[in-house]
Regions:
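N-terminal cap/lid segment of alpha/beta-hydrolase-fold proteins
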Residues: 31-73
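Conserved alpha/beta-hydrolase
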Residues: 101-123
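Short, surface-exposed "cap/lid" segments of acyl-processing enzymes
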Residues: 70-105
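Central antiparallel beta-sheet cores of small beta-barrel/beta-sandwich binding domains
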Residues: 1-23, 27, 37, 44
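Conserved catalytic-core motifs of eukaryotic protein kinase domains, centered on the activation segment
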Residues: 90-92, 124-128
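Alpha/beta-hydrolase active-site loop
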Residues: 130-150
Length: 188
């Protein structure tokens, strides 16, 4: 919460969250964001817009596949899972696109990635506002299955940020012996 007063055209006060409190001064102005990290084409890898279906929840997920040059079934592939709150495939915040930056780095270093819009956000369908972590885990499992069945990757892992890390560990702990069930590795 913020409590304060207007003084000399500024808002001056305290911002409090839980046990933390800090002084805060807000002034009007124009902020120009600099995002020099955002990858720009041409890329030394291939990108492909894809859609895949979570049939159990009747959700279509839309994403971007980044395929390194010379990829094949032994190329490592990573499903990228965003943190809490509905987000696009790039996990964009204030014009910064951390998942696009990470996917670019990985593709340049021989690792394929699949990042997708959360259900109910961007180009993905479904009800994201009422979705649970378990719902997002089923979406991520569908993404892993897409990489294994459709793209034929054999070494598929999960990279999860924030709530995405919880999803990654849920998938890793799933004891389903099916061929397409568990990630081969987790980055959290």
């Amino acid at each position: 919460t913020f409590t304060g007063r207007k003084q000399d055209g500024k808002l001056i006060g305290k911002c409090t969250q839980g046990a933390m409190s800090t002084d805060l001064e807000l002034s009007p102005g124009i902020v120009k964001l600099k995002r020099p990290q955002t990858p720009k084409p041409p890329y030394p890898y291939t990108t492909k817009e894809v859609r895949f279906n979570n049939l159990s929840d009747d959700v279509t997920l839309a994403g971007t596949l980044a395929l390194p040059e010379g990829f094949n079934e032994t190329t490592p592939a990573i499903v990228m899972i965003t943190g809490s709150g509905l987000q696009n495939r790039d996990e964009e915040i204030y014009g910064h696109k951390p998942f696009a930056v990470i996917a670019d780095y990985l593709a340049r270093n021989g690792i394929a990635t699949l990042r997708y819009d959360d259900r109910g956000y961007g180009e993905s369908t479904g009800d994201g506002k009422n979705a649970t972590t378990e719902d997002f885990a089923r979406d991520a499992k569908t993404a892993m299955e897409y990489l294994r069945k459709e793209m034929k990757f054999k070494n598929v892992g999960i990279l999860g940020h924030s709530e995405g890390a919880a999803v990654a560990f849920m998938l890793g702990a799933d004891n389903n012996p099916g061929l397409f069930s568990n990630p081969n590795f987790i980055i959290a």
